[in-house]
Amino acid sequence: MAEVILLCGKIAVGKTTYAAYLQRNRNAVVLSCDELMLSLFDSCLGDKHDATVKRCSLYLSGIADQVVAAGVDVVLDFGSWTAAERDAVRTFFAEHNIPVRLYYLFCEESARSERLRLRNIALRNADGRVYIIEEDLRRRLDAKFELPSENETDKLIDTTHLTV
């Protein structure tokens, strides 16, 4: 049976890179909340951002339900920063009898800082809407991250040396 893989980790740990790896190697479909948000909305939604992310996540979960029903694995590149967000995803798919596996991605802080620095440089020269994450924003977002418990984590992935 096809399954949903929920990626969890802080900014710049390699979730999107690992999602692309799974897409190639498992023939999975990747659904990204960031990609949907950037294609539909201005990069700054202010106080509406969290509610909009929740709605996008729900929409993509519905698409994932259909893809899994067709027999294809789905990788949710959502970040899944809080226990409540992860619980909501698991509850949704449990109600549809779809297995969910949580992959927690992490890396050394030095690797993460360098990835974010390089990503910001590349994005400043990119066309279209992008998320530039400066150091002060990164610290604020990191403070919101809730480490997943052992009970909710199916796979730990150290991406410090990830080169897929």
Which residues fall in each region the model found?
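Pre-Walker A (Motif I) flank of P-loop NTPase domains
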Residues: 1-5, 71-72
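A glycine- and Lys/Arg-enriched "phosphate-lid" helix/loop adjacent to the NTP-binding pocket
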Residues: 95-146
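Conserved nucleotide-binding/hydrolysis micro-motifs of P-loop NTPases
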Residues: 35-37, 106-112, 163
